[in-house]
Swiss-Prot record:
Subcellular location: Cytoplasm
GO biological process: carbohydrate metabolic process; glycerol-3-phosphate biosynthetic process; glycerol-3-phosphate catabolic process; glycerophospholipid metabolic process; phospholipid biosynthetic process
Residues engaged in binding NADPH: W14, R34, R35, K82, S114, R229, E255
InterPro entries: 6-PGluconate_DH-like_C_sf, 6PGD_dom2, G3P_DH_NAD-dep, G3P_DH_NAD-dep_C, G3P_DH_NAD-dep_N, NAD(P)-bd_dom_sf
Signal peptide: none
Organism per entry: Trichormus variabilis (strain ATCC 29413 / PCC 7937)
Gene from which this protein is expressed: gpsA
Catalytic residue positions: K165 (proton acceptor)
Functional note: Catalyzes the reduction of the glycolytic intermediate dihydroxyacetone phosphate (DHAP) to sn-glycerol 3-phosphate (G3P), the key precursor for phospholipid synthesis.
Pfam family, one: NAD_Gly3P_dh_N
UniProt lineage: Bacteria, Bacillati, Cyanobacteriota, Cyanophyceae, Nostocales
Catalysed conversion reaction: sn-glycerol 3-phosphate + NAD(+) = dihydroxyacetone phosphate + NADH + H(+); sn-glycerol 3-phosphate + NADP(+) = dihydroxyacetone phosphate + NADPH + H(+)
Protein known as: Glycerol-3-phosphate dehydrogenase [NAD(P)+]
Pathway: Membrane lipid metabolism; glycerophospholipid metabolism
Family designation: Belongs to the NAD-dependent glycerol-3-phosphate dehydrogenase family.
Highest taxon of source: Bacteria
Length: 307
């Protein structure tokens, strides 16, 4: 395998996990963080891949900083951030592509809980790009006997799968926190996936992408693991804590909280029916209790499963 120089943006749990995967494959790895002492300008020198694992709120600022430094035209950008920009409703890859229109941008997303990756437990992920050679380069850089990487030509679908499932994960935490049982959980995850597909189709994503690792796979992992911050938000809301109390002690960012608000705004503009997401939004806003949100979902007008 050809040795590659990779710059990881973000020294949080996910950034550190990805850095370790690349190091284990023999690549040269540099890590940038806001608290670090090295400048972006110094770290960018002779870099082949720039991988962003920063939180959604920092993406545009960091992309703009790198834009001003004029990276090599051969540099591949990879985004492993899951979220939406509130002002533009852009995904992370759309922000990177708008800043670097002549560079390949690759999305990395899948059912990847960083703690399990760090324990070398087997996992799989997806790298997606319109530029097949760029996706293949990233695939080779991160694939190993414990981390299987697939390519996909639908970057927006792969990216939205990882982003939209965070909202359903909050609902899943509520479901478990209220002890609603396996039947309710199965119904919630399945109907949540339907909402993800509806929103994704509006964006031009392929339906089948949502039934792959970055959609259903990530949804199942996040909705069933206490390791998920979004799941924890829902679980603790069901336990009677306020959103402010939960976020104050949460390690890291629960992107689903911000994503939910953006999705509801989009759905109302585009007339997309997303009842689970709507109830999560109302719960986060303090407009309903977890039990009231459940009742409103169960008492909706009856209808066919598929329109």
């Amino acid at each position: 395998m050809q040795e590659t120089t990779i710059l990881i943006l973000g020294a949080g749990a996910w950034g550190a996990s990805l850095a370790n995967l690349a190091l284990a494959n023999g690549h040269r790895v540099r890590v940038w963080s806001r608290r670090g002492t090295e400048t972006l300008a110094a770290l960018l020198e002779d870099v082949d891949i720039i991988l962003s694992a920063i939180s959604m709120k920092g993406v545009r600022e960091v992309a703009s900083q790198i834009q001003s430094l004029t990276p090599s035209p051969e540099t591949i950008f990879v985004t492993a951030t899951k979220g939406l920009e509130p002002e533009t409703i852009y995904t992370p890859s759309q922000i990177w592509q708008s800043c670097f229109p002549n560079h390949p941008v690759v999305v990395l997303s899948g059912p990847n809980l960083s703690k399990e990756i760090d324990q070398s437990l087997p996992a799989a992920t997806v790298v997606a790009s319109r530029i097949a050679t760029a996706a293949a380069t990233v695939q080779l850089a991160f694939s190993s006997s414990r981390f299987r990487v697939y390519t996909n030509p639908d970057p927006i679908g792969v990216e939205l799968g990882g982003t939209l499932k965070n909202v359903i994960a909050i609902a899943s935490g509520v479901c478990d926190g209220l002890h609603l049982g396996t039947n309710a959980k199965a119904a919630l995850v399945t109907r949540g996936l339907t909402e993800m597909v509806r929103i994704g189709n509006c964006w031009g994503a392929k339906t089948e992408t949502f039934y792959g690792l970055s959609g259903l796979g990530d949804l199942l992992a996040t909705c069933n693991s206490p390791l998920s911050r979004n799941y924890q938000v829902g679980y603790q809301l069901a336990g009677g804590q306020t959103l402010a109390q939960i976020l104050a002690k949460l390690p890291g960012t629960a992107e689903g909280v911000n994503t939910c608000q953006v999705l509801v705004q989009l759905a109302r503009q585009q007339n997309i029916v997303i009842p689970i997401t709507e109830q999560v939004y109302r719960l986060l806003q303090g407009e309903v209790t977890p039990q009231q949100a459940l009742d409103e979902l169960m008492l909706r007008d009856i209808k066919p499963e598929y329109n």
